[in-house]
Each structure stands twice: as structure tokens, then as C-alpha cells.
Amino acid sequence: SLEIDELARFAVDEHNKKQNALLEFGKVVNTKEQVVAGKMYYITLEATNGGVKKTYEAKVWVKPWENFKELQEFKPVDAATS
């Protein structure tokens, strides 16, 4: 969905800022939601790093009524497990 794509892009942007990285968002592969004083989104996404496509998992916490959005976690998915 558009909302999930936006959250995935947000996750990549935040990761890039924090890590001084240059990941380019590709596409959302999978997503799960959990309700926790807002919503926790677990987004599996593809991003490109220096021309190499990899899969990452992002955890984004959203509280829309507070206009709050925070990247909780961002990590590469081990190719062996996918």
C-alpha cells in the first residue's frame, strides 16, 4: 500500500541519516503490523547499496494522532534465512 511504501522510504532515509549510508529504496517485500500505543510496522524491503540489491528489515513505530514516527530498528536480512 501507499502508506507502507512511505514508511519503508522513511525507514531507509532515517537509516541513511543515522549511518551516513546511501541506501536507495527498492520495494516492499512483506509487512506485519502490531498494535502498541499506535502501530509497530515490521517491514521487509529491498534497497540498493552501491548497485547491490539487498533485503532489510525495518521496524517503524507510528502514533498518527501525535504525528509521531520513529525508526526503531533497521537491519540486513541474512540471505541464508530468506
Curated annotation (Swiss-Prot):
Alphabetized UniProt keyword annotations: Protease inhibitor, Thiol protease inhibitor
Q: Does the keyword Transport feature in the UniProt annotation?
A: no
Chain's role? Strong inhibitor of papain and ficin but poor inhibitor of cathepsin H, B and L.
A GO molecular-function descriptor: cysteine-type endopeptidase inhibitor activity
For whether the record's keyword set contains Ion transport, the answer is no
What's the family? Answer: Belongs to the cystatin family.
Q: Specify the species.
A: Helianthus annuus
Entry protein name: Cysteine proteinase inhibitor A
